[in-house]
Every structure is written in structure tokens, then in C-alpha cells.
């Protein structure tokens, strides 16, 4: 783990503080993407290493990187938008992963920004929940508007179940907060109904909230991560 952390610090950060998405075996940069998921996972790794090793300098590094992530997201023009100005939208995935990132870092270091981020994400998630479809959507307008296009109708059951997992974990942290628990269980139930393959079992990758054919080539496949997310989320649901 330490050798991997050392490699990340030595080779995986660009001069602007953002991370590369892919580097060569000897650390030369290959690709840099518009997301901050690499940074989020690196922050989690540093927090977990701090916990495992007892070296709290990595807790500080995790927190500083988390603050950088928030700055990257908040700074206009820092991250390349997914769409041109014709479409104004926001995505579910970054809102969701920041809950997990903040909660992992919170286990090794205290800072008000961590709870602040979790509260902000929990509030923002309400924009993606659409009771009329019994679904949590992957993309909505800036104020939660439904975007009735092939991309705006996407349901990613694994992502939604992962969100339920993170929400239930946070609810437990707050002494099983009733409102968060109920919201999470609703998302889990809806997402299970959308994602579960009644014939063969397992969670499939993508659905369309109007029941139309999804665009993604892997829409009817069952990658391994939605299955693991479903296992963890349902264990939390059982505990709740």
C-alpha cells in the first residue's frame, strides 16, 4: 500500500494539482480526464492508509486533497463540461461519491468541511429523485428539471444502490437518522425494482425511466460492481 501511495504522489499529479487518469508503468502521463474521481479515490486511499499505518500526515493529505476537489468543482472553467452550453445539466455520480469520500476522511481527521459536504450532497440528491418514475436519475437540469432525452432518462441501478448504501451509512453515523434512512430505503427499493433481472438474477447496468431502450452498449450486462454494491446496501438496509 505504501509503495502505491508513493507512486501516486510521485507520478500521478499534474502541476495544477489535478490527477492524471492513466500513466505508464514508469509514471509518465498518458491521459487526464474532466472528472475528479481519481482525486476522490486517492483521498480515500490516503485516509485508509493513515488509519492502517497510524501515520496521520496522510490524513492531512487526504483532507487537503478533498479541499482541492471542492475547489476544482467550484471554479468555473477548471473542469471541462460534459456538454456544450446548449445543455445545462448536473450529474448524480459526483454528488454521490463525495459523500463516501468525506465520510472516509472523517474517520481519521475532523474538519467542518467534511460534514458540510455530506449535508450538501444529501440535499442535492433530492433533485435527482423522481417519484413519478420511482427512480433516481443520473442527470437532471441545474434545478432538478427532468431532461426528456435518451441521456436524461438514464437510470443506473448500481449507482443508485451505491447512493442508498452511502446514505444508510451516514444515517447510521447519525444514530439512524429517520429521514435519511427512509429516503435511502426508498431509493434502494426503487433501484432494485429497476435493476433486478427477474429471469436470471443480478443487477443490470442501465434502464430508461420511460421503459425505452437505453443507449449504452452494456445496458443489459451485469458488471461486478453493481452486485457488490447491492450486497453492501442490502446489509445496511437489514441493519436499519
Tell me what each language-model feature is.
Residues 1-240:
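Glycan-recognition and catalytic cores of secretory/periplasmic carbohydrate-active enzymes
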Amino acid at each position: 500500500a505504501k509503495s502505491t501511495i508513493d507512486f501516486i504522489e510521485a507520478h500521478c499529479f499534474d502541476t495544477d494539482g489535478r490527477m492524471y487518469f492513466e500513466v505508464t508503468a514508469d509514471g509518465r502521463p498518458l491521459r487526464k480526464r474532466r472528472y475528479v474521481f481519481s482525486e476522490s479515490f486517492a483521498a480515500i486511499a490516503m485516509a485508509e492508509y493513515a488509519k492502517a499505518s497510524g501515520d496521520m500526515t496522510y490524513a492531512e493529505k487526504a483532507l487537503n486533497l478533498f479541499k482541492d476537489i471542492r475547489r476544482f468543482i467550484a471554479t468555473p472553467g477548471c473542469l471541462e463540461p460534459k456538454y456544450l452550453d446548449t445543455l445545462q445539466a448536473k450529474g448524480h455520480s459526483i454528488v454521490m461519491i463525495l459523500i463516501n469520500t468525506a465520510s472516509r476522511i472523517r474517520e481519521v481527521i475532523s474538519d467542518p468541511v467534511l460534514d458540510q459536504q455530506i449535508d450538501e450532497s444529501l440535499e442535492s440528491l433530492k433533485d435527482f429523485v423522481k417519484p413519478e418514475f420511482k427512480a433516481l436519475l443520473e442527470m437532471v437540469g441545474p434545478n432538478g428539471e427532468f431532461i426528456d432525452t435518451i441521456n436524461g432518462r438514464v437510470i443506473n441501478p448500481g449507482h443508485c444502490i451505491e447512493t442508498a448504501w452511502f446514505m444508510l451509512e451516514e444515517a447510521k453515523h447519525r444514530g439512524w437518522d429517520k429521514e435519511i434512512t427512509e429516503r435511502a430505503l426508498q431509493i434502494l427499493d426503487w433501484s432494485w425494482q429497476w435493476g433486478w433481472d427477474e429471469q436470471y438474477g443480478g443487477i443490470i447496468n442501465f434502464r430508461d425511466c420511460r421503459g425505452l431502450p437505453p443507449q449504452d452498449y452494456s445496458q443489459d450486462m451485469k458488471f461486478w460492481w453493481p452486485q457488490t454494491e447491492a450486497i453492501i446496501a442490502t446489509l445496511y438496509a437489514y441493519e436499519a
